[in-house]
Regions:
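Acidic/His- and Gly-rich active-site-bordering loop/insert found
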Residues: 1-117
Length: 121
């Protein structure tokens, strides 16, 4: 297996772990436990980011400031990790993280745990 294939395989496994975390956001539900579990997984997967950042946790959300060392203007990277309810029938479970024919299936694979993962990677 090539280095690129190994890297792609590792990336897929990491993203699968994010997809498999159920983070459904329901109107009126103020509980944050599932989001706190997701944050714990992020801390495990991206320890350097959490060590080097100022992290604020509020209402199930994270605000992270990573101080820079240059005089350039700051940038903003923004994403979300909640997903909508999984209703209807699914060919793959909504939180399965299945990979079939090179495609990763599950809530958040497009909107938007994938972009969050890419930013943190």
């Amino acid at each position: 297996m090539t280095t690129d294939e190994l890297r792609d395989q590792q990336y897929a496994k990491t993203l699968q772990r994010l997809i498999r975390m159920e983070t459904v956001s329901v109107a009126g539900d103020r509980s944050t436990e599932k989001f706190e579990r997701f944050h714990s997984l992020l801390r495990e997967l991206f320890p350097n980011l959490f060590e080097k950042s100022d992290v604020e946790n509020f209402s199930g959300s994270l605000l992270m400031r990573w101080p820079g060392e240059c005089s350039e203007k700051p940038i903003l990277l923004m994403s979300h990790h909640d997903v909508v309810e999984a209703v209807g029938s699914w060919s793959h479970g909504p939180f399965s993280g299945d990979i079939e024919d090179g495609k990763l299936w599950g809530r958040g694979s497009l909107d938007t745990k994938c972009s969050l993962w890419a930013m943190l990677q």
